[in-house]
């Protein structure tokens, strides 16, 4: 049993293949492959629940042992979001032969197993998206029809995208009946590339090109070739572009008139002797040459020098000259001597003697030559030694010796040190033939006069090196610093760029890359794009980050609202053409091709009407009518069949089924039953209707005159009739359904009344009938309407309405067209505001807004976004930066200004830890370790640590807080900076308004190991009467009291003491100055009186006062805590008091410390704060009120001193407070009245 693979392809593929018969290459070519990997059908069942083969075992309720004959069938079509199993397989379909039984598997790499693979070729641009329907079927060979069918075991539907690739994509389907695994891939055929397999590239090396193809299908020229088609040869390197060419790479073929290896030499005129050329066939003469061929010598005197014996030569013409001879000579060339010595030719005292050849010179000593004009060289051979230079003299020589030698021939050693040649040296040593200088450091050279160049490679980054003696100095280029100019000065360190600008450090400067909407050197200018008023027709303008936006009125559109909205009045709206649908194609520019929608069926041609309603009409073929050309015209309506014939309607034709005995197109001809001459023994045949009659002679009887005995024989009665001999004739008794003299006429009772419905034709067949149904009907009596909706023809969830041989698709919302394949483009009306992108969706649209816009149609403007370090934050965004909180408001970034301190790190071997770039992990100092050990703890610091303020004088800008911790509940390794970091990260600390710059710094108490002093400093006062220091301290107390902070460190706080200045009432009226003046006057009078009394008292008791109070009252550290009051949190009263100095007598309200200071002991109570009352109720609801006492005068109930609490200030603070005591009395009193110290016991 072999099942042959089959495949069907879309009409598009066939069309492209026909085109390929005459085109050089197809526009696209590839194939889709599917390979089955495994199948598991444990129960051997079908999707319907029935067994594949045989009945179910009633005992075990399982299928029989006979397994399924499993094969697979695929259908590949265009991408569908809602897959319809009906409709054509537009990309192709195919099936495998029977692969196996219920369960089987194949190796994925078995590429030779064609039995499990289905290959669907395509010749259109692969669209990447697809829908694949995979069916596992049980083979069923219908022997009666010869067709190959199958019953569905399991069906998988896969929609997605796949690009051409050699790699397989493995998919798995887990169905309720069976599970199977398969793999798919799309591969381009040879020479085709790209995502659509529509880029053709075939390597070639011929006249039309010389190239190979890379993996993307791009042409890669072979070596020596260039050009888009790689058919331009690359000539020999250096070959003249103007005068050379080549057809073979590496050659250089010269044009006519040019020569040379590179075709850069012109060919001169033939015969040109002393000339050159610039263009071919020229003859440009060399100097002193002339003539057409440059063969005429214009300087014979210079070339030949023909004049002898001192004659003077003159050029007189081309190739002509004249010699002017000296006295005593003649001839053309002065070659004849007449009186040679007459001209005194012998020089330098030489004696002239005439001879037959002219004259001879007898030269003086030291001279030689024909005329004694050559000085004899007395320096040859060189008589000077030790590289001395010989100077030739007349009849002698002179040696110029090197400095270390002397003498006539430089043989005597000279003492060079006598001339002090060494410039920068310790000493000079004379040597044979020279000397040696022992140079000072930094000098070199034979005479130590050359400064050693210490600048070699020292100054970096373009720095100018100034060479010094035994050293150097670098003059750095702008933007660099350091001894060697090795450090780039970072001009961006000060963060000069505003409004989110990104700073780029440059040489000796910086450059700000401004975010959209800002400009200027530091991005300080906010660009207002609406300043020029670009919006028209009353539109509102909004300035955005990098552009402007015009909010148009209802009837206008465009960037500037300058265009009237179309409303389909100017350009036509989207026309829904019911006659066509678009399919993927590579043969059209848009990638789509229109094909018929088949709305008029197979018997009509669609004609679309040009309006937006999608109306159409069908032009029907001959023989059909109806709206969709679905009705076959009844050609039997005129009853063309005669003689009782039955008319069968056909397409634009009819067929007559004649009654027995008749024939012809319309049954108009009686069949001649005598044509076979049935009568025997000379009987005469008479033709009847569907019968004959024989007139017998000579006593013959029977139907055919063949019997002597009876009128009946075996052929007398037809169709089972019984013959009865009645003497001279016979009679036939016919069987049911037949009549006539010889039972040859069939009764028409089977079709009476007509059993066939819906216009069908009834045809009598023996004793039965057959109904010939009209198109669109089926069944024995044509009573069943054919389901024209199967397979489902409507796309996109359209509803199919079945008619009589027609159907109609009622489309879901958002779709149109005859088969609901057209998605109505809601973006056609441009609903989105200008600058936004409209995305068409099913029955709707979606607007993609540009930055700065929002709303369903992007018509609303949001605040300007902020740009932070290349990141964009939307308007209203909030984020954390270390311990600070930042906000984006209309393009401006505002952050709280809390000093965050150094980052914690773990000490590693490299010393870098996890610190930012430019910082090192520095070990925590021992005095900074709060809960030991802290050996592994570190802090990230740069080379230059900023100064941290760890204490302050309490005022409106600063408060001092002392925290006492229960260290038993704290983990090990807690540092002082970690405690400070926890306080900075409290919500109440880091969310203070950005109008204040806040610093929270900490240090370990020197008096108690479980206390930490915290200084909270604010750079400026709050606005509208707010005091940020009081707000922060109150919030911290409230948070600590409720244990709201999720921190073990904050939860370990046992006591809080606050020292801060009481805020002044901002609403002081005009009476305040008056009251102050009155009080000041009274105070001055009292002070004067007290001062006079103190002078007299001091004179009397100076000796006793010295014994009682030998030291200054301001030298004791206790005075620094004189204003500290310890309070229980159940009764928080902020008081101010002044204590008497040590040595004062009890009970004295006023006493004199010195002549300049008077201390008044005053008790003042301030109202309880809200935080104090809340803390009292939550922590100590039943604690009695605590007694208020002076810090240094507290007594127990039995009169003994209460142990003093360790003071919070260190020695430096004591010195500061001591110096603060020595201020004028008025200033001292004001500060004492405004200072409040509170202690909170937690």
Curated annotation (Swiss-Prot):
Compositionally biased spans, kind Basic and acidic residues: 1210-1232
Glycosylation sites: 141, 218, 385, 560, 748, 960, 991, 1046
Signal peptide: 1-28
Ranges annotated as spanning the membrane: 1071-1095
Subcellular location: Membrane; Cell membrane
DSL domain segment(s): 186-230
GO molecular function annotation: calcium ion binding; Notch binding; receptor ligand activity
Protein name, as recorded: Protein jagged-1a
The species this protein was found in: Danio rerio (Zebrafish)
Organism lineage string: Eukaryota, Metazoa, Chordata, Craniata, Vertebrata
């Amino acid at each position: 049993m072999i099942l042959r693979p089959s495949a069907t392809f879309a009409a598009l593929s066939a069309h492209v293949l026909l085109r390929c018969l005459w085109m050089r290459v197809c526009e696209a070519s590839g194939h889709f492959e599917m390979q089955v990997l495994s199948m598991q059908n444990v129960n051997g069942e079908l999707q319907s629940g029935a067994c594949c083969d045989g009945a179910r075992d009633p005992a075990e309720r399982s299928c029989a042992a006979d397994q399924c004959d499993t094969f697979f069938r695929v259908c590949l079509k265009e991408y569908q979001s809602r897959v319809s199993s009906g409709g054509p397989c537009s990309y192709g379909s195919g099936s495998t032969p029977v692969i196996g039984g219920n369960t089987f598997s194949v190796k994925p790499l078995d590429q030779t197993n064609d039995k499990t693979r289905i290959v669907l070729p395509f010749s259109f641009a692969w669209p990447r998206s697809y829908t694949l329907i995979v069916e596992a079927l049980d083979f069923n060979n219908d022997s009666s029809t010869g067709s190959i069918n199958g019953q569905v075991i399991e069906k998988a539907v896969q929609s997605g995208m796949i690009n051409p690739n050699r790699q397989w994509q493995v998919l798995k389907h887990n169905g309720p009946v069976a599970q199977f695994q398969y793999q798919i891939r799309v591969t381009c055929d040879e020479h085709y590339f790209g995502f659509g397999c529509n880029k053709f590239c075939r390597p070639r090396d011929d006249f039309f090109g010389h190239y190979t193809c890379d993996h993307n299908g791009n042409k890669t020229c072979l070596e020596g070739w260039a050009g888009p088609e790689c058919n331009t040869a690359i000539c020999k390197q250096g070959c003249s572009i103007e005068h050379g060419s080549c057809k073979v790479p590496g050659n250089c073929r010269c044009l006519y008139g040019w020569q040379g290896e590179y075709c850069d030499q012109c060919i001169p005129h033939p015969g040109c002797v002393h000339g050159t050329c610039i263009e071919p066939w020229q003859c440009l003469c060399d100097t002193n040459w002339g003539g057409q061929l440059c063969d005429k010598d214009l300087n014979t005197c210079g070339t030949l020098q023909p004049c002898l014996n001192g004659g003077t030569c003159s050029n007189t013409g081309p190739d002509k000259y004249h010699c002017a001879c000296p006295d005593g000579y003649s001839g053309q060339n002065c070659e004849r001597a007449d009186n040679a010595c007459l001209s005194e030719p012998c020089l330098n005292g030489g004696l002239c003697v005439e001879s037959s050849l002219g004259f001879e010179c007898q030269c003086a000593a030291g001279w030689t030559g024909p005329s004694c004009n050559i000085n004899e060289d007395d320096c040859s051979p060189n008589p000077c030694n030790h590289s001395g230079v010989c100077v030739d003299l007349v009849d002698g020589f002179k040696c110029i010796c090197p400095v270390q030698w002397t003498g006539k021939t430089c043989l005597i050693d000279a003492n060079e040190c006598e001339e002090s040649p060494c410039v920068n040296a310790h000493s000079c040593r004379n040597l044979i033939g020279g000397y040696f200088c022992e140079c000072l450091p930094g000098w070199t050279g034979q005479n130590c006069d050359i400064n050693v160049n210490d600048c070699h490679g020292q100054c970096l980054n373009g720095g100018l090196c100034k060479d010094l003696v035994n050293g150097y100095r670098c003059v750095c280029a702008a933007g660099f610093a350091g001894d060697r100019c090795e450090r780039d000065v970072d001009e961006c360190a000060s963060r000069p760029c505003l409004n989110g600008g990104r700073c780029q450090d440059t040489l000796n400067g910086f450059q700000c890359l401004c975010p959209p909407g800002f400009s200027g050197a530091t991005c300080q200018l906010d660009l207002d794009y609406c300043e020029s008023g670009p919006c028209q027709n009353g539109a509102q303008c909004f300035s955005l980050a990098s552009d402007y936006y015009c909010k148009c009125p209802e009837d206008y559109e465009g960037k500037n609202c300058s265009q009237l909205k179309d409303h389909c009045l100017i350009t036509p709206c989207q026309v829904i053409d019911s006659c066509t649908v678009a399919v993927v194609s590579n043969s059209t520019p848009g990638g789509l091709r229109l094909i018929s929608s088949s709305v008029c069926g197979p018997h009509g041609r669609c004609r679309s009407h040009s309006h937006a309603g999608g109306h159409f009409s069908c032009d029907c073929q001959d023989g059909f009518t109806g709206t969709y050309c679905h009705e076959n015209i009844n050609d039997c309506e005129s009853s063309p069949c005669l003689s009782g014939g039955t008319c069968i309607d056909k397409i634009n034709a009819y067929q007559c089924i004649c009654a027995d005995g008749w024939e012809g197109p319309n049954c108009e001809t009686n069949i001649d039953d005598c044509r076979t001459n049935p009568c025997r023994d000379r009987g005469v045949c008479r033709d009847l209707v569907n019968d004959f009659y024989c007139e017998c002679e000579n006593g013959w009887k029977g139907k055919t005159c063949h019997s002597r005995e009876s009128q009946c024989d075996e052929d007398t009665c037809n169709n089972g009739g019984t013959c009865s001999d009645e003497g001279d004739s016979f009679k036939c008794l016919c069987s049911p359904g037949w009549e006539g003299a010889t039972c040859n006429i069939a009764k028409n009772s089977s079709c009476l009344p007509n059993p066939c419905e819906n216009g069908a034709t009834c045809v009598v067949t023996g004793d039965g009938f057959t109904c010939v149904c009209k198109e669109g009907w089926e069944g024995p009596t044509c009573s069943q309407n054919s389901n024209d909706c199967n397979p489902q023809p409507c796309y996109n969830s359209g509803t199919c309405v079945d008619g009589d041989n027609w159907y109609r698709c009622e489309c879901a919302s958002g779709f149109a067209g005859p088969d609901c394949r057209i998605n109505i483009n809601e973006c056609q009306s441009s609903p989105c505001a200008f600058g936004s992108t409209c995305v068409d969706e099913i029955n709707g649209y979606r607007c993609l807004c540009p930055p700065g816009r929002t709303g369903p149609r992007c018509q609303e403007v949001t605040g300007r976004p902020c740009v932070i370090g290349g990141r964009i934050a939307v308007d209203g965004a909030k984020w954390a930066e270390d311990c600070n909180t930042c906000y984006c408001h209309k393009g401006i970034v505002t952050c709280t200004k809390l000093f965050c301190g150094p980052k914690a790190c773990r000490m590693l071997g490299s010393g870098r830890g996890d610190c930012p770039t430019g910082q090192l992990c520095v070990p925590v100092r021992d005095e900074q370790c709060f809960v030991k050990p802290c050996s592994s703890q570190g802090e990230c610091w740069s080379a230059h640590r900023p100064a941290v303020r760890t204490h302050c004088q309490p005022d409106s800008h600063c408060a001092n807080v002392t925290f006492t911790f229960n260290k038993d509940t704290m983990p090990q390794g807690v540092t002082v900076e970690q405690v400070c970091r926890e306080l900075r990260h409290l919500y109440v600390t880091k969310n203070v308004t950005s109008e204040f710059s806040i610093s929270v710094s900490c240090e370990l108490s020197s008096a108690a190991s479980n206390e930490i002093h915290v200084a909270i400093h604010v750079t400026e006062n709050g606005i509208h009467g707010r005091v940020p220091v009081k707000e922060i301290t109150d919030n911290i107390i409230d948070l600590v009291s409720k244990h709201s902070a999720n921190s073990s460190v904050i939860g370990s706080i046992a006591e809080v003491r606050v020292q801060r200045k009481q805020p002044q009432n901002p609403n002081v009226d005009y009476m305040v100055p008056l009251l102050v003046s009155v009080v000041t006057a009274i105070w001055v009078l009292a002070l004067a009186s007290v001062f006079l009394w103190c002078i007299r008292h001091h004179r009397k008791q100076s000796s006793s006062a010295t014994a009682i109070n030998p030291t200054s009252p301001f030298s004791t550290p206790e005075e620094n805590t004189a204003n500290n009051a310890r309070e229980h949190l159940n009764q928080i009263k902020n008081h101010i008091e002044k204590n008497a100095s040590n040595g004062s007598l009890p009970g004295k309200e006023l006493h004199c410390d010195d002549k300049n200071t008077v201390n008044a002991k005053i008790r003042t109570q301030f109202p309880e704060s809200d935080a104090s009352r809340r803390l009292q109720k939550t922590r100590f609801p039943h604690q009695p009120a605590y007694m208020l006492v002076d810090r240094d005068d507290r007594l127990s109930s039995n009169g003994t001193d209460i142990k003093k609490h360790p003071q919070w200030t260190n020695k430096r603070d004591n010195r500061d407070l001591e110096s603060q005591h020595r201020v004028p009395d008025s200033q001292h009193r004001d500060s004492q009245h405004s200072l409040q110290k509170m202690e909170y016991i937690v």
